[in-house]
Amino acid sequence: MKQGKWLDTSISFMSMSGYSAPPIFWVALLLIMVFSLEYQLFPVAGRYDLLYEIDHVTGFAIIDAFMAKGEYRAHALQSVIEHMVLPCLVLALAPTTQVVGLMRSSVAEVMSQNYIRAARIKGLSNREIVTQHVLRNAIPPIIPKVGVQLSSMITLAIITESIFNWPGIGRWLLDALASQDYASIQAGVMVLATLVLTANILSDLIGAMINPLVRKEWYANK
């Protein structure tokens, strides 16, 4: 709510760190050295411990572990979750900080508008101002930009899967490139392109649907 305070400064520092973050493979190796090798909190690589046999029904490790039968299902599910922590953290670190920075800029722009001053003059509390005015006007411009983040996350996923030995479409593409399997390369690129295009279209539509200005234009054109 207040620019220049410790919370606003922390968010600004976090967002700038995301834009100027070191390479993802360096971050991944650093987390492996600290949390896996030094403190032994999380596994180094793989999807789950080799002690458990999980049938590949859906291809999603956490769903397959949940659907597995046997007395060790809970332990297998815990193993899958522990193996997911570091890859998910590495994959989400840079995009999350960038989205937080975009959200901060959007909130700061909304807070400087005249209707926010009018709401304060009316005696509305900070909570009412944030929920009824700030978020409703700050979130819609961010949603299309979040959809654009998907293309960069796919690139990060390819590197993350290779480092953590996690089987996925990114590692599958790298194996196809190594073996010169052009049919698999074409299929993988087509799937990723369709996924990115669909995500961008949906993010634009959702952002337009919840944008008050766009809704007013739609109602006016009816």
What are these regions (language model features)?
Residues 1-16, 28-33, 157:
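Transmembrane-helix boundary motif in ABC transporter permease subunits
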Residues 16-84:
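Generic hydrophobic transmembrane alpha-helix motif, especially the helices
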Residues 1-8, 55-222:
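Alpha-helical transmembrane segments of integral membrane proteins
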Residues 12, 44, 131:
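Phosphate-coordinating loops and pocket residues in cytosolic domains that bind phosphorylated ligands
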